[in-house]
Amino acid sequence: MRAELCADLEEALRAGGHEVVRIERACFDIFVRTRDGRAYIVKVLINADGLRREVAEELRRISHFLEAVPVVVALKRHTGPLEKGVVYHRYEVPVLDPLTFARLVEGEPPKAVADRGGQYVVIRADEVDELDVSRVRRRQLRREGGRITLARAEEADVEGVPVELKTPEHVDTGRDRMTRFERRVAELLERMGAERTGKVRRAPFKLLAKDGETVLARAEEGGDRESIALRDVASATGSMGVIVTRERCKDTYVPTIDIGTLEEIKDLEDLKEYLQERDPEERVRRLVEEAGITSPREIAQRTGIRESVIREFLRRMGITDERKV
Protein backbone atom coordinates (compact mmCIF):
# COMPACT_ATOMS: atom_id res chain seq x y z
CA MET A 1 0.00 0.00 0.00
CA ARG A 2 2.88 2.37 0.76
CA ALA A 3 4.43 1.62 -2.64
CA GLU A 4 1.11 2.44 -4.32
CA LEU A 5 0.87 5.71 -2.39
CA CYS A 6 4.43 6.59 -3.48
CA ALA A 7 3.64 5.79 -7.10
CA ASP A 8 0.40 7.78 -7.07
CA LEU A 9 2.12 10.78 -5.50
CA GLU A 10 4.99 10.63 -7.98
CA GLU A 11 2.59 10.40 -10.92
CA ALA A 12 0.53 13.36 -9.70
CA LEU A 13 3.62 15.51 -9.16
CA ARG A 14 5.00 14.74 -12.62
CA ALA A 15 1.61 15.41 -14.19
CA GLY A 16 1.67 18.82 -12.52
CA GLY A 17 4.91 19.68 -14.29
CA HIS A 18 7.16 19.44 -11.24
CA GLU A 19 10.65 17.91 -11.25
CA VAL A 20 10.61 14.64 -9.34
CA VAL A 21 13.40 12.29 -8.27
CA ARG A 22 12.28 8.92 -6.91
CA ILE A 23 14.64 7.43 -4.34
CA GLU A 24 14.67 3.85 -3.06
CA ARG A 25 16.14 2.47 0.15
CA ALA A 26 16.76 5.87 1.70
CA CYS A 27 15.37 7.99 4.54
CA PHE A 28 13.21 9.83 1.99
CA ASP A 29 11.23 8.62 -1.00
CA ILE A 30 10.81 11.62 -3.27
CA PHE A 31 12.64 14.86 -3.98
CA VAL A 32 10.39 17.51 -5.53
CA ARG A 33 11.39 20.75 -7.23
CA THR A 34 8.21 22.70 -7.95
CA ARG A 35 7.63 24.78 -11.05
CA ASP A 36 8.37 27.92 -9.05
CA GLY A 37 11.58 26.52 -7.53
CA ARG A 38 10.48 25.34 -4.08
CA ALA A 39 12.08 22.08 -2.91
CA TYR A 40 10.64 19.32 -0.73
CA ILE A 41 12.19 16.20 0.77
CA VAL A 42 9.28 13.77 1.08
CA LYS A 43 8.91 10.65 3.21
CA VAL A 44 5.81 8.59 2.41
CA LEU A 45 4.14 6.53 5.14
CA ILE A 46 0.73 5.01 5.70
CA ASN A 47 0.84 5.76 9.44
CA ALA A 48 2.77 8.90 10.41
CA ASP A 49 3.56 7.32 13.78
CA GLY A 50 5.97 5.05 11.91
CA LEU A 51 8.44 7.92 11.51
CA ARG A 52 11.38 7.22 13.83
CA ARG A 53 13.35 9.99 15.51
CA GLU A 54 16.63 9.13 13.74
CA VAL A 55 14.92 9.21 10.33
CA ALA A 56 13.30 12.56 11.16
CA GLU A 57 16.73 13.95 12.08
CA GLU A 58 18.14 12.81 8.73
CA LEU A 59 15.21 14.36 6.85
CA ARG A 60 15.85 17.66 8.62
CA ARG A 61 19.61 17.44 8.04
CA ILE A 62 19.30 16.78 4.30
CA SER A 63 16.68 19.52 3.96
CA HIS A 64 18.96 21.95 5.78
CA PHE A 65 21.83 21.39 3.35
CA LEU A 66 19.62 21.29 0.23
CA GLU A 67 17.52 24.29 1.32
CA ALA A 68 14.38 22.19 1.12
CA VAL A 69 11.36 21.57 3.34
CA PRO A 70 11.06 18.11 4.92
CA VAL A 71 7.54 16.65 4.73
CA VAL A 72 5.97 13.35 5.71
CA VAL A 73 2.98 12.46 3.53
CA ALA A 74 0.75 9.96 5.32
CA LEU A 75 -2.84 8.78 5.56
CA LYS A 76 -3.32 8.46 9.30
CA ARG A 77 -1.85 8.49 12.78
CA HIS A 78 -2.83 6.87 16.07
CA THR A 79 -5.87 9.13 16.52
CA GLY A 80 -7.30 8.36 13.09
CA PRO A 81 -7.14 9.69 9.50
CA LEU A 82 -5.27 12.94 8.88
CA GLU A 83 -7.54 15.93 8.34
CA LYS A 84 -7.26 17.82 5.07
CA GLY A 85 -5.76 21.29 5.32
CA VAL A 86 -4.11 20.56 8.67
CA VAL A 87 -0.38 20.41 9.47
CA TYR A 88 0.65 17.79 12.01
CA HIS A 89 4.18 17.36 13.34
CA ARG A 90 6.32 14.43 14.40
CA TYR A 91 9.84 15.07 15.69
CA GLU A 92 9.67 18.60 14.21
CA VAL A 93 8.86 17.32 10.70
CA PRO A 94 5.58 18.53 9.15
CA VAL A 95 3.07 15.76 8.40
CA LEU A 96 0.38 16.23 5.73
CA ASP A 97 -2.22 14.08 4.04
CA PRO A 98 -1.70 13.58 0.26
CA LEU A 99 -4.31 16.14 -0.84
CA THR A 100 -2.96 18.83 1.49
CA PHE A 101 0.56 18.21 0.18
CA ALA A 102 -0.66 18.35 -3.43
CA ARG A 103 -2.29 21.70 -2.72
CA LEU A 104 0.85 22.95 -0.98
CA VAL A 105 2.96 22.09 -4.02
CA GLU A 106 0.50 24.01 -6.19
CA GLY A 107 0.91 27.09 -4.01
CA GLU A 108 -2.01 26.63 -1.61
CA PRO A 109 -0.54 26.24 1.90
CA PRO A 110 -2.56 24.77 4.78
CA LYS A 111 -4.05 27.10 7.38
CA ALA A 112 -4.46 24.92 10.46
CA VAL A 113 -1.97 23.25 12.80
CA ALA A 114 -2.69 20.26 15.03
CA ASP A 115 -1.52 20.76 18.60
CA ARG A 116 -2.45 19.60 22.07
CA GLY A 117 -6.12 20.16 22.59
CA GLY A 118 -7.14 20.32 18.96
CA GLN A 119 -6.53 22.10 15.68
CA TYR A 120 -5.73 25.78 15.53
CA VAL A 121 -5.47 28.65 13.08
CA VAL A 122 -3.84 32.06 13.44
CA ILE A 123 -6.05 34.98 12.44
CA ARG A 124 -5.10 38.56 11.63
CA ALA A 125 -5.60 41.44 14.05
CA ASP A 126 -8.56 42.81 12.11
CA GLU A 127 -10.19 39.37 12.21
CA VAL A 128 -9.75 39.27 16.00
CA ASP A 129 -11.77 42.48 16.21
CA GLU A 130 -14.61 40.83 14.29
CA LEU A 131 -14.98 37.91 16.71
CA ASP A 132 -18.03 37.85 18.94
CA VAL A 133 -16.03 37.75 22.20
CA SER A 134 -15.40 40.04 25.15
CA ARG A 135 -12.75 42.76 25.15
CA VAL A 136 -10.73 40.78 27.66
CA ARG A 137 -10.77 37.77 25.35
CA ARG A 138 -9.75 39.94 22.38
CA ARG A 139 -6.76 41.30 24.30
CA GLN A 140 -5.82 37.75 25.27
CA LEU A 141 -6.03 36.60 21.65
CA ARG A 142 -3.78 39.44 20.52
CA ARG A 143 -1.20 38.47 23.16
CA GLU A 144 -1.38 34.87 21.92
CA GLY A 145 -0.83 35.95 18.31
CA GLY A 146 -4.43 35.47 17.24
CA ARG A 147 -4.51 31.70 17.67
CA ILE A 148 -7.99 30.19 17.87
CA THR A 149 -9.42 26.73 17.31
CA LEU A 150 -10.23 25.67 13.78
CA ALA A 151 -13.84 25.10 14.79
CA ARG A 152 -14.12 28.66 16.13
CA ALA A 153 -12.53 30.07 12.96
CA GLU A 154 -15.03 28.19 10.80
CA GLU A 155 -17.89 29.35 13.02
CA ALA A 156 -16.73 32.98 12.70
CA ASP A 157 -16.09 32.53 8.96
CA VAL A 158 -12.46 33.71 9.14
CA GLU A 159 -9.80 32.01 7.03
CA GLY A 160 -6.65 32.44 9.06
CA VAL A 161 -3.05 33.02 8.07
CA PRO A 162 -1.40 30.34 5.85
CA VAL A 163 0.97 28.03 7.72
CA GLU A 164 4.54 28.56 6.53
CA LEU A 165 6.65 25.41 6.26
CA LYS A 166 10.32 26.30 6.49
CA THR A 167 13.74 24.83 5.78
CA PRO A 168 15.26 23.66 9.09
CA GLU A 169 17.87 26.16 10.30
CA HIS A 170 19.43 24.45 13.31
CA VAL A 171 20.22 20.76 12.91
CA ASP A 172 22.65 18.17 14.18
CA THR A 173 25.09 17.83 11.27
CA GLY A 174 26.00 14.24 12.18
CA ARG A 175 29.75 14.87 11.98
CA ASP A 176 30.36 12.66 15.01
CA ARG A 177 29.12 9.68 12.96
CA MET A 178 31.63 10.10 10.13
CA THR A 179 34.19 7.38 9.47
CA ARG A 180 37.85 8.36 9.51
CA PHE A 181 37.92 8.50 5.70
CA GLU A 182 34.70 10.54 5.56
CA ARG A 183 36.10 12.95 8.13
CA ARG A 184 39.19 13.43 5.98
CA VAL A 185 37.02 14.20 2.94
CA ALA A 186 34.95 16.64 5.01
CA GLU A 187 38.11 18.38 6.24
CA LEU A 188 39.32 18.81 2.66
CA LEU A 189 35.97 20.26 1.57
CA GLU A 190 36.11 22.68 4.50
CA ARG A 191 39.63 23.69 3.52
CA MET A 192 38.29 24.42 0.03
CA GLY A 193 35.73 26.82 1.47
CA ALA A 194 32.75 24.80 2.66
CA GLU A 195 31.37 26.37 5.83
CA ARG A 196 29.29 23.37 6.85
CA THR A 197 29.68 19.64 6.37
CA GLY A 198 27.39 16.87 7.51
CA LYS A 199 26.82 13.14 7.44
CA VAL A 200 23.71 11.10 6.62
CA ARG A 201 23.31 7.34 6.62
CA ARG A 202 20.15 6.58 4.67
CA ALA A 203 20.68 8.37 1.36
CA PRO A 204 22.48 7.83 -1.97
CA PHE A 205 25.02 10.37 -0.69
CA LYS A 206 26.67 10.17 2.73
CA LEU A 207 28.42 13.53 3.00
CA LEU A 208 27.02 17.01 2.49
CA ALA A 209 28.92 20.28 2.23
CA LYS A 210 27.56 23.77 1.80
CA ASP A 211 28.87 27.23 0.97
CA GLY A 212 27.17 28.73 -2.05
CA GLU A 213 27.81 25.47 -3.90
CA THR A 214 26.29 22.36 -2.34
CA VAL A 215 28.36 19.18 -2.58
CA LEU A 216 26.72 15.76 -2.34
CA ALA A 217 29.43 13.18 -1.87
CA ARG A 218 29.91 9.52 -1.15
CA ALA A 219 33.28 8.55 0.27
CA GLU A 220 33.02 5.03 -1.11
CA GLU A 221 32.01 3.17 -4.22
CA GLY A 222 28.43 1.96 -4.42
CA GLY A 223 26.07 0.18 -6.76
CA ASP A 224 24.73 1.63 -10.00
CA ARG A 225 21.33 2.33 -8.44
CA GLU A 226 22.91 4.49 -5.73
CA SER A 227 25.05 6.31 -8.27
CA ILE A 228 22.06 7.09 -10.50
CA ALA A 229 20.10 8.39 -7.51
CA LEU A 230 23.05 10.53 -6.42
CA ARG A 231 23.33 11.98 -9.91
CA ASP A 232 19.60 12.68 -10.16
CA VAL A 233 19.40 14.46 -6.81
CA ALA A 234 22.53 16.50 -7.58
CA SER A 235 21.05 17.51 -10.94
CA ALA A 236 17.66 18.45 -9.48
CA THR A 237 19.21 20.52 -6.69
CA GLY A 238 21.94 22.16 -8.77
CA SER A 239 24.56 20.52 -6.57
CA MET A 240 27.91 18.92 -7.27
CA GLY A 241 27.66 15.14 -7.06
CA VAL A 242 30.92 13.26 -6.54
CA ILE A 243 32.27 9.93 -5.35
CA VAL A 244 35.57 10.14 -3.47
CA THR A 245 37.67 6.97 -3.36
CA ARG A 246 40.92 5.89 -1.76
CA GLU A 247 42.30 4.87 -5.14
CA ARG A 248 41.29 5.31 -8.75
CA CYS A 249 38.09 3.39 -9.37
CA LYS A 250 36.00 2.15 -12.26
CA ASP A 251 33.81 4.62 -14.10
CA THR A 252 30.34 5.25 -12.75
CA TYR A 253 27.32 7.47 -13.37
CA VAL A 254 28.84 10.20 -11.21
CA PRO A 255 32.21 11.97 -11.49
CA THR A 256 34.79 10.32 -9.24
CA ILE A 257 37.97 11.59 -7.67
CA ASP A 258 40.56 9.80 -5.59
CA ILE A 259 41.59 11.26 -2.24
CA GLY A 260 45.10 12.08 -3.45
CA THR A 261 43.78 14.24 -6.28
CA LEU A 262 41.23 15.85 -3.96
CA GLU A 263 44.05 16.91 -1.65
CA GLU A 264 45.63 18.88 -4.53
CA ILE A 265 42.52 20.92 -5.38
CA LYS A 266 42.52 24.45 -3.97
CA ASP A 267 38.87 25.46 -3.68
CA LEU A 268 35.30 24.46 -4.49
CA GLU A 269 35.34 26.33 -7.80
CA ASP A 270 38.35 24.29 -8.95
CA LEU A 271 36.60 21.13 -7.75
CA LYS A 272 33.52 22.04 -9.77
CA GLU A 273 35.64 22.60 -12.88
CA TYR A 274 37.48 19.30 -12.33
CA LEU A 275 34.21 17.37 -11.99
CA GLN A 276 32.61 19.03 -15.02
CA GLU A 277 35.57 18.09 -17.20
CA ARG A 278 35.29 14.45 -16.10
CA ASP A 279 31.52 14.14 -15.95
CA PRO A 280 30.84 10.82 -17.74
CA GLU A 281 27.42 11.89 -19.04
CA GLU A 282 28.81 15.10 -20.52
CA ARG A 283 31.62 13.15 -22.19
CA VAL A 284 29.05 10.87 -23.82
CA ARG A 285 26.88 13.82 -24.79
CA ARG A 286 29.80 15.57 -26.49
CA LEU A 287 30.59 12.51 -28.60
CA VAL A 288 26.95 12.20 -29.63
CA GLU A 289 26.53 15.87 -30.49
CA GLU A 290 29.96 16.63 -31.95
CA ALA A 291 30.90 13.34 -33.60
CA GLY A 292 27.43 11.86 -34.17
CA ILE A 293 28.42 8.59 -32.48
CA THR A 294 25.64 6.63 -30.77
CA SER A 295 27.17 3.17 -30.64
CA PRO A 296 27.75 2.21 -26.97
CA ARG A 297 30.66 0.03 -28.03
CA GLU A 298 32.40 2.79 -29.97
CA ILE A 299 31.80 5.36 -27.23
CA ALA A 300 33.20 2.89 -24.69
CA GLN A 301 36.33 2.40 -26.81
CA ARG A 302 36.88 6.16 -26.99
CA THR A 303 36.11 7.01 -23.36
CA GLY A 304 36.73 3.89 -21.30
CA ILE A 305 33.25 4.22 -19.81
CA ARG A 306 31.30 1.00 -19.30
CA GLU A 307 28.75 0.19 -22.00
CA SER A 308 25.97 -0.27 -19.41
CA VAL A 309 26.58 3.27 -18.16
CA ILE A 310 26.66 4.62 -21.72
CA ARG A 311 23.34 2.94 -22.57
CA GLU A 312 21.69 4.62 -19.59
CA PHE A 313 22.99 8.03 -20.69
CA LEU A 314 21.82 7.41 -24.25
CA ARG A 315 18.40 6.38 -22.95
CA ARG A 316 18.15 9.66 -21.05
CA MET A 317 19.02 11.49 -24.26
CA GLY A 318 16.20 9.68 -26.07
CA ILE A 319 18.55 7.54 -28.17
CA THR A 320 17.58 3.88 -28.21
CA ASP A 321 19.57 2.56 -31.15
CA GLU A 322 22.98 3.05 -32.70
CA ARG A 323 22.02 5.20 -35.67
CA LYS A 324 23.98 8.33 -36.48
CA VAL A 325 22.45 11.60 -35.28
Curated annotation (Swiss-Prot):
Q: Which residues bind DNA?
A: 139-158
Keywords tagged on the record: DNA-binding, Transcription, Transcription regulation
Superkingdom in the source lineage: Archaea
Where does the HTH cro/C1-type domain start and stop, copy by copy? 128-190
Q: Respond yes or no to whether keyword Transcription regulation is given for this record.
A: yes
Please tell me whether the keyword Lyase is annotated for this protein: no
User: Which InterPro entries does this UniProt record tie to the protein?
Assistant: Arc_TR_HTH
Q: What GO molecular function annotation could you give as one example from this UniProt entry?
A: DNA-binding transcription factor activity
Could you tell me what this protein is called? Answer: Putative HTH-type transcriptional regulatory protein MK1005
